[in-house]
Amino acid sequence: MTQRAPLKRPNAVYRNFDEVKVDDYLTDVFTEEAVHFIQKNQHRPFFLFLSHITPHTPLQTIEKYSRRYEHLSDKRARIYASMVASLDDSVGRIVKELESLGLSENTLIVFASDNGCAGYIEGACSNAPYSGFKRYHQEGGIRIPLIMSWDNFLPRGQTYKQPVITLDLYSTFVAAAGHAGFSTIDSVNLIPFVKEEVNSSPHKYLYWRSGPPYAIRDERWKLMRYSVAPYTARDLGNDGRLTPPKGGWPHELSSEKITLLYDLKADPSEQNNLADSHPEVVKRLTTEYETWASSLAKPMIPAIRSTLADIDGTTVQLIF
């Protein structure tokens, strides 16, 4: 088997291993590539994963989108809204193509994000009413849109309220392809739950871990722990990050840490830390998390990206 050399310019645009010169707005370019892929494969089963760069930094737009938001006085917010508009148009363009080819009744469409709005873009977007941002385990960092559409198969206009995770898309896609009995420890087929064929919740617990900081939640409660930072803003570089030690940041919490417990049903904005008043919940969730964490393989790649954040009045270290 012939192996190709590593990409010479990782931030360039490639088709397979060949660099492509792109002059147009990248969102539009990716959209047209996706439409072409659908047209080419319309007579056979296909899987299309379209991972748009927008609205990631750097914040950039073009006139056909920005003119829709001339009424916004803040430049960053105007550009960000324009980028979201380009994303919205992309989804519409792809859905329209599926409909025009008569594929919408046989195609599962999923729209999702990887994280919430980033705090470092200074007010261009908001996660309100949720707290936290990208890189955080607060709801503002991990609670994202998840939209599923499948004409004449999934119910329209329904809101599914049980906690799920994007890992579930793996088993869901496999089931949609005809292997409904397939499942893994981490991934659950969501189709029978969304169709209300199953009354239980897909998960008893959901877990997040990024270096030492972690979170675990059940249907009601959410527990988080962060290491208290032995650093200040003066230790941050020009990129807003801490310089990692040799070998990377530790994978375990420091001896000085904060514990946060929130009742997400009563307090989805995570404003009232109930850790001290509900020690039994803290203990239960801690035990569940530690059992899960002990089953994981040790990280192969050192953690080198880190910054500081103020959470519940304490400066903590985020690792991402």
Give the ranges of each region predicted by the language model.
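C-terminal, low-complexity/hydrophilic appendages and adjacent surface loops
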Residues: 138-142, 208-275
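Formylglycine-dependent
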Residues: 1-45, 52-61, 81, 230, ...
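Short, solvent-exposed turn/loop segments enriched in Gly/Ser/Thr/Pro and often Arg
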Residues: 49-60, 111-117, 186, 209-211, ...
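Substrate-binding rim/cap in mid-to-C-terminal beta-strand-loop elements of soluble/periplasmic
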Residues: 4, 8-18, 92-100, 126-184, ...
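A structural signal for well-ordered alpha-helical segments within the folded catalytic domains
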Residues: 28-32, 78, 85-89, 164-171, ...
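Core domains of carbohydrate- and sulfate-ester-processing enzymes
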Residues: 1-16, 56-62, 120-144, 221-247, ...
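Structural recognition of the beta-strand scaffold that forms the well-ordered cores
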Residues: 47-51, 108-112, 146-148, 165, ...
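Active-site regions of oxyanion-processing enzymes, predominantly non-cytosolic
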Residues: 26-68, 95, 99-108, 139, ...
